């Protein structure tokens, strides 16, 4: 992966303002990239940051988290910024866990808090060449004779 990145962005309700503030602070670094954001988060980003290329997905509880997960599994999402509210229950917790699991499984850079997001956005790999190491799961897939 080099140059323009496809970035997933999600923020729980209590973290949306944090994400908007973070995007404002890092706007110039984000402009060259494509952002795919769930529901309300995507709408807020579009309202405030017309310079960004934003593709809105469905709301997280309505399938947006799963849409981003599908993009990860298909190799179409390069990184994920997901500001999580650890203090609130989430009715779609299983969808959230599935999204986080896919980010780990496919070894994409993922930030779940602002500090990690700061480290990712300032990394030389953000605009430079980076080829993530992907584990070969062929033995797992073939364990029961699947092809």
Swiss-Prot record:
Molecular functions per Gene Ontology: methylglyoxal synthase activity
Gene Ontology BP term (one): methylglyoxal biosynthetic process
Keyword Phosphoprotein annotated: no
Enzyme class: lyase
Keyword terms of this UniProt record: Lyase
Task of the protein: Catalyzes the formation of methylglyoxal from dihydroxyacetone phosphate.
HAMAP family documented for this protein: Methylglyoxal_synth (MF_00549)
Descriptive protein name: Methylglyoxal synthase
């Amino acid at each position: 992966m080099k140059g323009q990145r496809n970035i997933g962005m999600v923020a729980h309700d209590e973290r949306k303002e944090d994400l908007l503030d973070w995007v404002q602070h890092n706007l110039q670094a984000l402009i060259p990239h494509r952002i795919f954001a769930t529901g309300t988060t995507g709408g807020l980003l579009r309202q405030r940051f017309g310079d960004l290329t934003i593709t809105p997905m469905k709301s997280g509880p309505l399938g947006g988290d799963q849409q981003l997960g599908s993009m990860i599994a298909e190799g179409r999402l390069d990184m994920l910024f997901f500001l999580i509210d650890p203090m609130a229950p989430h009715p779609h917790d299983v969808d959230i866990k599935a999204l986080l699991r896919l980010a780990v499984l496919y070894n994409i850079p993922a930030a779940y808090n602002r500090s990690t997001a700061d480290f990712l956005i300032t990394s030389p790999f953000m605009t430079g060449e980076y080829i993530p190491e992907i584990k070969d799961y062929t033995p797992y897939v073939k364990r029961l004779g699947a092809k």
